[in-house]
């Protein structure tokens, strides 16, 4: 059995991670930490877990974490990098669900997160954890940076086009119009997240610049092998009055080659063997509720004009966009079937 530690167990991603791991046939959750709830039974805070765990929250103790096989950090940015070096030295694998190991560009990390990176040598050897695109590197990784939720929808939405043998799109003209449920903002109380601020309301945020923009740019450069062509991408996220779910609508200008290509077949072939990416029939409309609670991402393509392409990409922001993808990465790191513990079907309605 894989001995697991979770640092940060009271947030939405932390409890979602615990929910998934408690059902995992190869995992024992050894420790679950909280800065504020040490000594409290997990099931008392989250009644949905009653009968499934006797765990109590505990203070973060690095010596205890070093007895685990893998430690997940479901914490704010800046926490995992404080402990990664010591854990790696002790032979413990690390999966960070925050941003400490997403960006290889230290200047961009410090600019967007306002933190000086505490272990750049570990960052250099870490692997970006988008399972479908980096699985071979993830298998041998000691530290994995779990991707951001929005960047996951964008990368999987664009990868078949960017890795084609010929230029199919004009990358400098990409527009990403993304929407997320409010759970993406976390569980910490804040004025902007209360019911009366979000119910019956719909708003954009981070329009002048969002932390996921540099992550998207760096990742697309890696996928395509092209530098400097994605800097002008427009990315605008929105907050919608629902709890879970994320939909990214990606607008693309096609090259002449792209306009004359069978893009539906391109996507179907590219993702044919992927367990967690579903390419829907042409002109379908993927809905967030179809992936609620599941580690799945659904994609649909539209060509409203001969030289235009619209990509729709949906996922549960807490599962494929966070905790589920982290478990998927753990499975790869421990040479398990990638879908172990992740075969749940989306909830409907």
Curated annotation (Swiss-Prot):
* Keyword vocabulary terms for this entry: Amino-acid biosynthesis, Arginine biosynthesis, Cytoplasm, NADP, Oxidoreductase
Q: Which InterPro entries match?
A: AGPR_AS, AGPR_type-1, NAD(P)-bd_dom_sf, NAGSA_dehydrogenase, Semialdehyde_DH_NAD-bd
A molecular function (GO) held by this record is: NADP+ binding
> Hey, which pathway is this one from?
Amino-acid biosynthesis; L-arginine biosynthesis; N(2)-acetyl-L-ornithine from L-glutamate: step 3/4
BP terms from Gene Ontology:
L-arginine biosynthetic process
Major subcellular site: cytoplasm
Tell me the Pfam families matching this sequence.
Semialdhyde_dh, Semialdhyde_dhC_1
Q: What does this protein do?
A: Catalyzes the NADPH-dependent reduction of N-acetyl-5-glutamyl phosphate to yield N-acetyl-L-glutamate 5-semialdehyde.
What the entry lists under NCBIfam families is as follows: argC
Any idea what this protein is called? N-acetyl-gamma-glutamyl-phosphate reductase
- Per the UniProt entry, what species is this protein from, by scientific name? Acinetobacter baylyi (strain ATCC 33305 / BD413 / ADP1)
List the top taxonomic levels of the source: Bacteria, Pseudomonadati, Pseudomonadota, Gammaproteobacteria, Moraxellales
Gene name, per UniProt, is: argC
């Amino acid at each position: 059995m894989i001995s697991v530690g979770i640092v940060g167990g009271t947030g939405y991603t932390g409890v979602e991670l615990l929910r998934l791991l408690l059902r995992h046939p190869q995992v024992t959750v050894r420790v679950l930490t909280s800065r504020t709830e040490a000594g409290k039974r997990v099931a008392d805070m989250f009644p949905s877990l009653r009968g499934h765990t006797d765990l109590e929250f505990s203070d973060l103790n690095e010596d205890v974490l070093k007895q685990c096989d893998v430690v997940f950090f479901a914490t704010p940015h800046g926490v995992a990098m404080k402990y990664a070096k010591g854990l790696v030295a002790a032979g413990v694998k690390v999966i960070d669900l925050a941003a400490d190991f997403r960006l290889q560009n230290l200047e961009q990390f410090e600019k967007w997160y306002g933190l000086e990176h505490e272990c750049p040598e570990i960052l250099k050897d870490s692997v970006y954890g988008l399972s479908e695109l980096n699985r071979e590197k993830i298998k041998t990784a000691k530290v994995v940076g779990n991707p951001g939720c929005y960047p996951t929808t964008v990368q999987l939405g664009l990868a078949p086009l960017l890795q084609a043998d010929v230029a199919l799109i004009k990358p400098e003209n990409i527009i990403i119009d993304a929407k997320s449920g409010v759970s993406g903002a976390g569980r910490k109380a804040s004025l902007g997240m209360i019911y009366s601020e979000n119910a019956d309301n719909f708003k954009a945020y981070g329009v002048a610049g969002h932390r996921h923009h540099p992550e998207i740019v760096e990742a697309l450069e890696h996928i395509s092998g092209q530098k400097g062509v994605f800097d002008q991408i427009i990315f605008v996220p929105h907050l919608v009055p629902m709890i879970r779910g994320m939909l990214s609508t990606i607008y693309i200008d096609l090259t002449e080659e792209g306009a004359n290509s069978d893009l539906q077949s391109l996507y179907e072939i590219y993702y044919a063997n992927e367990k967690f990416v579903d390419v829907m029939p042409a002109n379908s409309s993927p809905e967030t509720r179809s992936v609620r609670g599941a580690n799945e991402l659904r994609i649909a393509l539209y060509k409203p004009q001969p030289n235009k392409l619209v990509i729709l990409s949906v996922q549960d922001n807490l599962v494929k966009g966070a905790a589920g993808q982290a478990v998927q990465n753990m499975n790869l790191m421990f040479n398990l079937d990638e879908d172990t513990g992740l075969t749940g079907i989306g909830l409907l309605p």
